[in-house]
């Protein structure tokens, strides 16, 4: 039912795209449907398919090299967009901080965390569907059963660590951070000029910043859920070989791990 629902929505999207392409001045890159091993289908830019394939192979090689070095491999799910008062560059720094914290906790000699905010993931002129095709292919691995030993979903405590929250006037700290950064970071200053307000920034990072409010993270959660469903149903894996899911560094309860979240 889930796949049929996805495909029906996708069919409508393809028809709408085709119709819009016929309007004057709508010179868009050609798109086509690509489906992954776990049954996720995306309407992607044909011009980016080769680039996406190259990126996927690059990430798979990184994973293989790190695993050959004896390391456990984790995937970091983190909100990166500036929706709702966030800032892309700040979120990127939080991702780097979270990756470093996880590797420090377990030991960098034995742990490697793939951070999707790496420059290697950039797709020139890529849209959401293009990025999701790339990351779905990376997450599911060559065999469609997952290429990671665990998934780490970033939560409020990961943001709190980055900002130095201590439970005493944390919104004040965000006000001070905002004022300092707008004076020292031209890109942040430009974001403010384009509409980012201190109030929205303060509310977002004090109350909302988490994979809970990230559309992409919702899709990644569902992908890992599907991978574990496939593993449970396959005799080569079984329940004992599911991919562990962590939120803010703590293991997710079985009932939660098997639950579907809203699509991004």
Residue ranges of predicted features:
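Bacterial N-terminal signal peptides
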Residues: 11-22
């Amino acid at each position: 039912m889930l796949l049929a629902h996805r495909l029906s929505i996708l069919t409508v999207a393809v028809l709408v795209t085709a119709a819009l392409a016929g309007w004057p001045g709508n010179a868009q890159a050609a798109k086509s449907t690509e489906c992954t091993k776990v049954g996720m289908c995306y309407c992607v830019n044909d011009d980016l398919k080769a680039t996406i394939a190259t990126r996927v192979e690059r990430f798979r090689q990184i994973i293989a090299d790190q695993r050959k070095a004896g390391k456990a491999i984790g995937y970091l799910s983190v909100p990166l967009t500036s929706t709702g008062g966030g800032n892309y560059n700040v979120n990127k720094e939080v991702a780097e901080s979270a990756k470093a914290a996880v590797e420090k906790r377990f030991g960098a000699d034995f742990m490697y965390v793939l951070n999707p905010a790496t420059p290697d993931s950039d797709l020139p002129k890529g849209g959401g569907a293009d990025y999701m095709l790339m990351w779905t292919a990376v997450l599911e691995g060559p065999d469609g059963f997952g290429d990671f030993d665990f998934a780490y979903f970033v939560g409020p405590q990961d943001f709190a660590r980055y900002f130095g929250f201590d439970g005493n006037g944390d919104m004040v700290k965000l006000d001070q951070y905002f004022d300092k950064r707008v004076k020292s970071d031209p890109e942040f200053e430009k974001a403010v000029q384009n509409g980012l307000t201190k109030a929205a920034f303060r509310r977002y990072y004090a109350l909302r910043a988490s994979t809970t409010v990230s559309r992409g993270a919702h899709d990644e959660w569902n992908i890992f859920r599907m991978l574990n469903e496939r593993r449970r149903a396959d005799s080569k894996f079984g329940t004992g070989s599911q991919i562990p899911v962590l939120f803010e560094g703590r293991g997710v309860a079985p009932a939660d791990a098997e639950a579907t979240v809203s699509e991004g």
